[in-house]
Regions:
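Aromatic- and Gly/Pro-rich amphipathic surface segment
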Residues: 55-71
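Primarily secretory-pathway and cell-envelope proteins
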Residues: 18-59, 111-161
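Mid-length scaffold segments of soluble, non-membrane domains
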Residues: 66-114
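Flexible, active-site-adjacent loop/turn segments at secondary-structure boundaries
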Residues: 14, 52, 62, 78-80
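Generic detector of short, well-ordered, non-transmembrane alpha-helical segments enriched
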Residues: 13-14, 88, 153
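Bacterial Sec-dependent N-terminal signal peptides
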Residues: 1-20
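Residue-level detector of alpha-helical segments with a strong bias toward transmembrane helices
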Residues: 12-15, 46, 94
Length: 161
């Protein structure tokens, strides 16, 4: 009888064990100093995996969480200029509305959205700007956010896929 109980316990313990596997869209988290301002970006990096992304998986004209899984986050240690608007120091969600020739980029005040906020609230947009798209010579397998052209007065945030 003890042996039988032991087998049941052993079976229960092994059936409850979870096999941990890598995320399909791994999290990226980095900090960059630009001038005297610390910028931190956290996002998930979806992969193409043979899929058509723009205009298909991510439809044109729809708001996108700008990554996968949870919404992408950006924080600034100091006030920054986004386009022609001052964005206060703090943490924001990054959302985008892709189109073929340009993207609308939104810095959204609510950061605990776990994806797209429901409902979308225009009054929570802290800043937005429209940027032109450029074709890359080599597509990237993984969606990438980077901070480039860094100098003491500013930098560019690049979204590439």
């Amino acid at each position: 009888m003890r042996f039988f109980k032991f087998l049941i316990f052993l079976f229960s313990a092994t059936s409850l064990a979870q096999v941990e596997t890598p995320q399909a869209s791994p999290i990226a988290d980095f900090t960059q100093i630009v001038g005297l301002t610390e910028i931190k970006i956290t996002y998930s990096r979806p992969s193409m995996r043979g899929r058509k992304i723009m205009g298909d998986l991510i439809p044109y004209g729809a708001i996108w969480r700008t990554g996968a899984n949870d919404n992408s986050l950006i924080s600034f240690s100091d006030d920054v200029l986004v386009g022609n608007k001052t964005l206060k120091a703090g943490k924001y969600s990054i959302y985008t509305r892709p189109e073929k020739s340009n993207w609308e980029v939104y810095f959204y005040n609510k950061t605990d959205n776990s994806g797209l906020p429901k409902p979308w609230d225009e009054s929570l947009i802290a800043a937005s700007l429209t940027v032109k798209t450029k074709n890359v010579s080599e597509p990237r397998e993984n969606f990438t956010i980077s901070i480039e052209s860094i100098n003491n007065d500013g930098a560019f945030i690049r979204l590439a896929w």
